[in-house]
């Protein structure tokens, strides 16, 4: 079907009056018709994410139901436990979509647990494992703008779905009609016992599990730490207060962002990676006692921090900087207690700062680099678990503000990360220092590794094709230098080949194939290019290494300028 065929198919369906009116309002808007009906919203390992609205290429109760039916059909075809867990965030329609998913699972005879209120994404990962489920779903679009929502899908280990089951779910979805009516209502399945709410007991078990990951809780209780916290109108408010409150942290909450708000009126793009995400926090922190600012994204799997600079302003750490600062803190504290097991590992994504490798090596711990996506960090935990050695996982992080200590969940967790940030800040406060002081010491000790992430966003109906062409052009035309530094090696993760340009020697990359290209600049740094898995854009990850911060910054600026042309 072309886009008009799809549009007419929807117009002829038995739909609620408000949806019919929405469809009628775009009848003469060709661009809107193509956007909404140019295809079906795609399902992948991250599930589905898109703008909410009527249409086959939009997120609505029909596309969500179809995706959940595909998940249910896949689960029914496996030997996995016929149980599912579902969570949802603060976005518009999140609770509705969660209930739609629950009904789809119940129709397939799958016992379904649904969080009784909005909950962070890592709590869903925890629930899948704790309740022994075969799969899980979170309704969330993470840090996207308010017009978006999504369906994040999880496997039995609490990781986001891997390629093989996701491909099967996609195939199942393709066989399902859009408008198959529900056999029973949500309330009827609740009465039947096929759908059950996840109540306070599991929340408390999660809190205790997170608290058990504290490195030095008594130290934190005695530090008198003051933080300013924003949940960015999302799910972090309750669990962050519960965990940090038990540890004696004094919390000032940003009032205008404390309550759930699907419009995100005070922060249009609630992404903790951006400077603007903490703007309201800066205002509050000027008049409140503050050792550190914490901000969690709407589904509370990512966290960002800022620290007072001593001159009335604040310095926001990058996701990389917070990652290697937490890594250094955990390794230093556990080394002091002689508490690091032999063969211990830490894990980072390939696009995260290699400065972390130097920190891990200093403490005699292996650092593994995996593909982007926290499921690959979770995969390393699974390997240890299969050997009966899960305690050897120390810490994992991604530069996009995602961190995990512990094996209770298999996705990044802003709650445990917030606790670790407070521990780090408290330990430094007791020494008369702050996180900025410690960051300067880390750079001085391990080297000046400066990082920058650049997103090139593409537009138009063929935006994804443009992203693919950009990657193909980079493969075909390898630059001799970037920012004045010679390109010494090229790693093509799609071909699983690393090539030394001087010798021509090729080696195999022992990672799953992925559309990622890395240019190594010897000991000067690297540039990595990868298309987004969910949006029409290509991301460039820069690392520049210098003898001092000024040299590293000069190289970084030259690298970005060249690749931006």
Where are these regions (language model features)?
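N-terminal small/polar loop signature for handling phosphorylated ligands or for N-terminal nucleophile
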Residues: 85-148, 245-246, 250-304
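Conserved phosphate/anionic-ligand binding catalytic regions in large, soluble enzymes, centered on
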Residues: 37-57, 141-144, 231-243, 298, ...
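Gly/Ser/Thr-enriched, mixed-charge loops and adjacent short helices
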Residues: 10-14, 32-37, 41, 149-277, ...
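Phosphate-binding and adjacent anionic-ligand microenvironments
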Residues: 286, 290-292, 313, 333-530, ...
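Short acidic, glycine/serine/threonine-rich loops at helix termini
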Residues: 95-100, 125-129, 147-153, 174, ...
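An N-terminal, well-structured beta->alpha segment
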Residues: 5-101, 190, 195-227, 235
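Buried hydrophobic positions in well-ordered alpha/beta secondary-structure cores of metabolic enzymes
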Residues: 46, 86, 124, 137, ...
């Amino acid at each position: 079907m072309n886009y008009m065929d799809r549009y007419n198919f929807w117009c002829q369906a038995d739909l609620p009056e408000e949806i019919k009116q929405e469809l009628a309002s775009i009848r003469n808007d060709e661009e809107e018709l193509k956007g909404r009906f140019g295809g079906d919203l795609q399902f992948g390992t991250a599930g589905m994410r898109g703008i909410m609205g009527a249409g086959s290429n939009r997120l609505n109760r029909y596309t969500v139901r179809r995706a959940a039916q595909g998940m249910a059909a896949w689960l029914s075809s496996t030997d996995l436990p016929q149980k599912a867990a579902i969570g949802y965030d603060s976005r518009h329609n999140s609770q509705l979509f969660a209930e739609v998913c629950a009904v789809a699972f119940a129709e397939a005879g799958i016992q379904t647990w649904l969080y009784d209120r909005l909950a962070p994404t890592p709590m869903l990962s925890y629930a899948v494992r704790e309740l022994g489920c075969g799969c899980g779903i979170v309704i969330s679009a993470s840090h996207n703008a308010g017009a978006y929502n999504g369906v994040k899908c999880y496997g039995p280990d609490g990781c986001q779905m891997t390629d093989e089951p996701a491909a099967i779910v996609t195939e199942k979805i393709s066989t399902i009609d859009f408008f198959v009516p529900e056999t029973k209502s949500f309330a009827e399945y609740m009465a039947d016992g096929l759908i059950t709410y996840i109540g306070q007991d599991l929340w408390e078990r999660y809190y205790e599990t997170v608290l058990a990951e504290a490195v030095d809780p008594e130290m934190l209780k005695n530090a008198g730490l003051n933080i300013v916290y924003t949940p960015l109108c999302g799910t972090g408010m309750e669990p962050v207060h519960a965990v940090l409150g038990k540890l004696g942290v004094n919390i000032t909450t940003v009032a205008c962002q404390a309550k759930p708000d699907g419009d995100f009126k005070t922060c249009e793009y609630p992404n903790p990676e951006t400077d603007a995400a903490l703007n309201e926090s800066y205002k509050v922190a000027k008049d409140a006692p503050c050792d550190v600012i914490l901000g969690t994204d709407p589904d509370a799997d990512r966290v960002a921090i800022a620290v007072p600079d001593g001159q009335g302003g604040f310095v926001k750490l990058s996701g990389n900087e917070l990652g290697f600062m937490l890594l250094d803190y955990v390794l230093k504290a556990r080394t002091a207690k002689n508490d690091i097991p032999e063969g211990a590992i830490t894990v980072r994504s390939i696009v995260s700062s290699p400065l972390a490798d130097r920190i891990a090596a200093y403490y005699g711990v292996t650092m593994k680099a995996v593909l982007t996506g926290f499921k690959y960090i979770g995969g390393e935990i699974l390997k240890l678990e299969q050997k009966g050695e899960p305690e050897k996982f120390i810490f994992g992080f991604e530069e996009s503000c995602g961190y995990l200590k512990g094996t209770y969940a298999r996705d990044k967790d802003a709650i445990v990360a917030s606790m670790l940030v407070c521990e780090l800040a408290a330990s430094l406060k007791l020494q008369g220092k702050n996180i900025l002081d410690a960051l300067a010491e880390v750079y001085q000790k391990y080297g000046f590794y400066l990082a920058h992430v650049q997103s090139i966003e593409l537009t138009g109906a063929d935006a994804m094709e443009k992203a693919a062409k950009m990657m193909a052009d980079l493969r075909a035309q390898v630059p001799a230098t970037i920012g004045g530094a010679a390109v010494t090696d090229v790693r093509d993760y799609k071909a699983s080949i690393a090539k030394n340009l001087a010798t021509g020697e090729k080696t195999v990359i022992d990672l799953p194939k992925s559309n990622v290209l890395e240019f190594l600049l010897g000991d000067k740094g690297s540039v990595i290019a990868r298309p987004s898995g969910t949006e029409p854009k290509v991301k460039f990850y820069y690392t520049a290494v210098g003898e001092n911060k000024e040299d590293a910054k000069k190289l970084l600026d030259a690298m970005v300028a060249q690749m931006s042309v």
